[in-house]
Amino acid sequence: MADQQEKTASSAVPETQPPSQTAETTTQTTATPAPEVQTEQTQPTESGPSAANTTTEQPTNPPAAEASKENAAPAPAPAAEDAPSEPAPAQEQQKEEKPADNKPEYLAKNPALSQLFDRLPTVLSNSGHDEMWGVPLRDSSDVPTVNVLIKFLRANEGNVKLAEDQLTKALQWRKQTRPTALVEGRYSAKKFGGLGYLSTYKDADGKETVITWNIYGGVKDLGTTFGNVDEFINWRVALMELAVKDLKMDQATSVIDYEGEDPYQMIQVHDYLNVSFLRMNPSVKAATKKTIDVFATAYPELLREKFFVNVPSIMGWMFAAIKVFLSKNTTRKFHPISNGANLAREFPPAVKEQFPKVYGGSAPDLHEGARTVALEEDNEPAPAPAAPAEPTEEAKPEQEAPKQEPAPEAPKEEAIKEALVEAPKEEPKQPAVEEPAKTDTAVTTQETVAPAEAK
């Protein structure tokens, strides 16, 4: 029997090859109900190789071959379908990760900063100005620009919308006011002489400390200094811009640590020596309010610490009360000192020695060793021309009138001359105004109460 089977098998090989091809085609056509066979995938995996051998030995049994081919054919099919489906999301993840890798670390760690940079083109378009503190605002690869945006973002506690609004307003204000040009201006020595100074001290490592001094006790006449609010603001802004220049933000090479120390900040000293806290002059109040509004909007996060020196000890309760209503980030910057000679103790020894003697250091007084804005003497009394302005207008039509009436012109010209002579006489009649100068402190009082300027 075995011999007969071998003979029949050997003789049947050439005859069965065509049917095997037809069988394969039939299996491929009949393999459409593969799902039914997939339930048995584990069993045919071992029979797969044997099926190829048994096709020649058992030609009379095509269903077994068909079953094995059906099981073998669909088995790789789902693997082929599953194979591309798995790497697809991996590729998508790589595509998503690539832009994140390309971002600088300060943007990757701070999504709010990245969003603010996305809004920067709109801010520049709406404001029509692209300069802030001497820094031309560019893209996120420009370090000085990054530091400017970080300051506005920190001032608004990470709120992108609020930071965008404040940055827009600050740029609009700079466009209208042109503070960089105010630095080059000249101001009345009579009104502002001795009231504001700027110092830059270096420590042992060469690190600079920028200090602005506001000597409110030096005001001689409240009406003269604060009467013209816009003029006072221009002088105050010019002094601030000088200090901003010394911060050298436009030369920055490293990005500010959003959660760490900001090296681009200054110290402010407000001296209240001989200043009264009891009365508030209306002109002082108006100038103070305008100053706070401007500085709160246009100079955020430029203040490291603020020292109130020569403050009466009785005013200590005011600072204690203020801390209840202000954030810790703001109140930690306020330092009231009753004796100005103790101010230098708050700084390292190398810096301490550079302070004026009156503030506990070894250097000359501020008017000798510190800088200030350009001042000029008033050759003509400023308020005097304002009074005769109206009579001169009346005189003009009379001068243009026919010369038939020369008599009335003479007395009017004399009246004008008398007004010009009397005007300066009225100023010396106000020696008592020197006392109200003490009330100038009201300016700093409000500044201490208002956290806006301290930001």
Swiss-Prot record:
Q: Which reaction does it catalyse?
A: a 1,2-diacyl-sn-glycero-3-phospho-(1D-myo-inositol)(in) = a 1,2-diacyl-sn-glycero-3-phospho-(1D-myo-inositol)(out)
Which InterPro entries does the record associate with it? CRAL-TRIO_dom (IPR001251), CRAL-TRIO_dom_sf (IPR036865), CRAL/TRIO_N_dom (IPR011074), CRAL/TRIO_N_dom_sf (IPR036273), Sfh5 (IPR042938)
Question: Single Gene Ontology BP term?
Answer: regulation of exocytosis
- According to the UniProt entry, which residue ranges have a biased composition of type Low complexity? 14-40, 63-82
The cellular component terms of Gene Ontology attached to this UniProt record, alphabetical and capped at eight, are:
cortical endoplasmic reticulum; cytosol; endoplasmic reticulum membrane; plasma membrane
Where heme binds, per the record, is at 216, 236, 270, 272, 306
Q: Which UniProt keywords apply?
A: Cytoplasm, Endoplasmic reticulum, Heme, Iron, Lipid transport, Membrane, Metal-binding, Microsome, Transport
CDD domains annotated for this entry? Answer: SEC14
Tell me which cofactor or cofactors this protein depends on: heme b
Q: Where in the cell is the protein located?
A: Cytoplasm; Endoplasmic reticulum membrane; Microsome membrane
Residue segments, region Disordered: 1-106, 376-455
Task of the protein: Non-classical phosphatidylinositol (PtdIns) transfer protein (PITP), which exhibits PtdIns-binding/transfer activity in the absence of detectable PtdCho-binding/transfer activity. Regulates PtdIns(4,5)P2 homeostasis at the plasma membrane. Heme-binding protein that may play a role in organic oxidant-induced stress responses.
Q: What is this protein called?
A: Phosphatidylinositol transfer protein sfh5
Q: Which organism is it from?
A: Aspergillus oryzae (strain ATCC 42149 / RIB 40) (Yellow koji mold)
